[in-house]
From Swiss-Prot:
Belongs to the ninF family. The gene is ninF. This is Protein ninF. It comes from the Viruses.
Length: 56
């Protein structure tokens, strides 16, 4: 039983240390996504973060 818990913990740590977008290992100062993915997501390539203009 202890081995299963340890394995689960190791897998959890590995998942926490990888980019949620591309799976690359994160740098110490990076959280959730790597620098490259962060820059790509912040550039909003699909324009999904722009508010719609009201013509009213």
């Amino acid at each position: 039983m202890i081995d299963q818990n340890r394995s689960y913990e190791q897998e959890s740590v590995e998942r926490a240390l990888t980019c949620a977008n591309c799976g690359q290992k994160l740098h110490v100062l990076e959280v959730h996504v790597c620098e490259h993915c962060c820059a790509e997501l912040m550039s909003d390539p699909n324009s999904s973060m722009h508010e719609e203009e009201d013509d009213g």
